[in-house]
Amino acid sequence: MKDVLERFLGYIKVDTQSSEESDTVPTTKTQLEFAKKLGEELKAIGLKDVSVDESGYVMATLESNIDKKVPAIGFIAHMDTSPDLSGTNINPRIVEKYDGQDIVLNKEKNIVLKINEFPEILEYKGQDIVVTDGNTLLGADDKAGIAEIITAMEYLINHPEIKHGTIKVGFTPDEEVGKGADHFDVKKFGADLAYTLDGGGIGELECETFNAAKAKVIIEGRNVHPGSAKNKMTNAVLVANKFINTLPENEVPERTEGYEGFFHLLSVKSEVETAELNYIIRDFDRKKFEERKEQIKEVGKKINEEYNKEIVCVKVEDQYYNMKEKIDEVKYVVDIAYDAMKAIDIEPILVPIRGGTDGSRLSFMGLPTPNLFAGGHNFHGRFEFVPVLSMEKAAELVVKIAELYANR
């Protein structure tokens, strides 16, 4: 599985950031260009039925090499990188045989990956680790997943003695902006079940995601000359401040963990005349999720009552739901992944995803899709890193899962 590093380093050279602002599909042209390159690579290694549609979805098939019928399994990763930090001109560095000390990413800017801030890196002492130069994210989320899947497919093609059923490969655009499954054709894909490789550190096996919604809060103020503003001006900036401070201060990402939900204020655009707040709402428990949506609406309602006019408008839109309720219906998909990890000497770590994957939506579209580790850490930022061995083991895991299904 040594080719996985070379593939990964090649993929991250292509800037495939998605965009929250764009209405095109995919949201950026570079994703479509990257999709076409991946399509050509899949053809070159010998996959069949390779397609790249106008929306940027890549699909391909590795045909079964056994006579008996077993479930067709899919492996899925996303092509875009997060809009949270630049993915242009990524300049990776391989830290060989990591010595367990702080890693200076950028000496000139004094950007250091510190072990007291990111202690999980100590788990990889002695291993080769790919890091950034401190100016961009790395793109292991999720180009590591793509590299792992393609490397595994090539390995299976080159080792026909490993028996497997039909395998479907899928690469999606715009996962980072919540649109990865919008135009995914489950019927065309043709898998009975699937796995995304979009998780974090080695061993992660995830079948629970947040329930997710987004909220846009529009505040209409009224600007009047400050010299004569008494009882006339409505300062949207101050109303926005009131709205923000009315929500629970401890129910935010930086103060929650595990199964705890939160309100996350993504952005504020504000002046006296108008203000706009953009939130995401997350909770694992469906009942608490619904309560959170009502809670944020209630804040707007109370402010309107206080001002005795409709100055706050709160619009809430669901994004995806906790896939656990769908995965539980076909629990064996998790059991096989668990057994596959054990078989290749990986200790499975069953954890909830404090986020979402394409699998969240796909599971509710009829394709049960738990999530496997891709190996990276600290996604969406300059401190992102991925151990080389973790990528190699992820590729090995894909092969082992295919093998276990063939032997069921």
UniProtKB/Swiss-Prot annotation:
One MF term in the entry's GO annotations: zinc ion binding
GO cellular component: cytosol
GO biological process: peptide catabolic process; proteolysis
Source organism: Clostridium botulinum (strain Okra / Type B1)
Gene3D superfamilies in the cross-refs: 3.30.70.360, Zn peptidases (3.40.630.10)
Family statement drawn from the similarity comment of this UniProt entry: Belongs to the peptidase M20B family.
Protein name as it appears in the record: Peptidase T
Catalytic activity: Release of the N-terminal residue from a tripeptide
NCBIfam families the record matches: peptidase-T, PRK05469.1, PRK13381.1
Pfam families: M20_dimer, Peptidase_M20
Residue numbers binding Zn(2+) 2: D141, E176, H380
Catalytic class of the enzyme: hydrolase
CDD domains: M20_peptT
Cofactor: Zn(2+)
